[in-house]
Regions:
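Position-specific recognition of the canonical hydrophobic site in helix A of tetratricopeptide repeat
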Residues: 13, 47, 102, 136-137, ...
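Residue-level recognition of tetratricopeptide repeat
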Residues: 10, 44, 99, 133-134, ...
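Single-residue signature of alpha-solenoid repeat helices
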Residues: 21, 54, 76, 110, ...
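Flexible helix-coil transition and linker loops at the boundaries of alpha-helical arrays
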Residues: 67-69, 81-86, 186-190, 224-234, ...
Length: 354
């Protein structure tokens, strides 16, 4: 691995053994075990040791593929600064240096380095993406961040991650659901590459009242677990079905509402996660009871409403996806009203307003 060559060669550099270090990096190049930093380190080493070949090494560094290159060592700062001095037209050296500074929370230095890189090469999408995130997160420059992220996406409309990040910026600046949905749906091939983009489209469909489309899209996609996504897919799965069930109840199609609500109680495999112990299902059972009531099946309706009053009764902040949600208490109250237990129902409602 390139890192092993770097470790030993940098030890040689620390001892002032520039020729030996350069020899080791040349072995790495011969073996094909390289990253762009291999060439930057070699160029810096040759410069420090006043050896020949530094100019060629730094030229090779500037042309090397930048994919997955994330310098993180303190020595990398010296090597990249050397490259910026010796080869001032190299746009990648300040880009890598900005990445390193940002990782070390030196945000002003990172922005300065990235801006230098952008001036040297304004056709590199990632530099605009990085500048967008830094301006939004560290400078609160919303308009500039969006301008830069849009530029990054225009430069490479095959990058699904940048599409996702651009949409997230639109969400943060409160673009309308309809506008965001129309934008995303221009790129179905990119959406299909990422579960989070598929979920975002489904969420926007639900938020714009397109429940049937949301349900169809969600049911056709196989999701995979990802950190930070816990509970989001089942949430939209259930939301679409509850809203469709409510529409069926309003139209008097009670038998149509029941299977939709029953589906909310089961998590099919394609959601990518299972139902947690103690999941609150008050609203599902409340509406199911209403459907059975509409069909004249009062016993089944009462059974559903009894299920709907089960669960925590004290409102609390829902900080995590698996925390008890206070709005479920509202449906407990509605179910208690249906059961004729007025005092208990008012007690639930009072807790939500006191």
């Amino acid at each position: 691995l390139p890192i092993y060559y770097d470790e030993i060669a940098l030890d040689y550099c620390s001892a002032g053994c520039w020729s030996e270090a350069a020899g080791l990096w040349n072995v790495a190049i011969t073996e094909g075990s390289v990253t762009p930093m291999t060439y930057y380190y070699l160029g810096w080493c040759l410069t420090q040791g006043k050896l020949s070949g530094a100019e060629q090494a730094l030229a090779d560094a500037a042309q090397a593929c930048s994919d997955y290159c994330f310098p993180n060592r303190l020595e990398a700062i010296l090597a990249l600064q050397c490259a910026m001095e010796q080869n001032p037209n190299d746009a990648k050296a300040p880009y890598y240096l900005g990445n390193l500074y940002y990782d070390k929370r030196q945000y002003d230095l990172a922005l300065e380095a990235w801006e230098t890189s952008a001036k040297l090469d304004d056709k590199f999408p990632t530099i605009w993406r990085n500048l967008a995130l830094a301006n939004f997160n560290k400078k609160n420059e919303e308009a500039r961040a969006i301008e830069y992220m849009e530029r990054a996406f225009r430069l490479d409309k095959t990058d699904a991650r940048v599409l996702m990040e651009l949409d997230q910026l639109y969400k943060r600046v409160r673009r309308s659901h309809a506008e965001r949905l129309a934008f995303l749906q221009q790129y179905p091939e990119l959406i299909a590459q990422r579960d989070d983009l598929v979920l975002e489209e489904i969420t926007l469909l639900n938020q714009t009242g397109e429940y049937e489309k949301a349900k169809t899209l969600l049911d056709a996609h196989i999701f995979h677990p990802w950190e930070g996504g816990e509970g989001k897919v089942p949430g939209q799965y259930q939301f679409a079905r509850v809203e469709l069930a409510k529409k069926a109840l309003e139209a008097g199609n009670y038998s149509q509402a029941i299977p939709l609500l029953e589906e909310c109680l089961e998590y099919p495999h394609h959601l990518g996660e299972g139902k947690l112990y103690g999941a609150q299902e008050n609203d599902f059972y409340y509406f199911m009871g209403c459907a059975y009531e509409g069909l004249g099946q009062s016993d089944k309706a009462a059974e559903c409403w009894e299920q709907a009053i089960v669960g925590p009764t004290e409102p609390a902040a829902a900080m995590y996806y698996n925390d008890a949600k206070p709005d479920k208490i509202f449906y407990q109250g509605l179910a208690l009203l249906k059961l004729g237990r007025m005092d208990e129902a008012n007690g639930r409602f009072h807790k939500l307003t006191s």
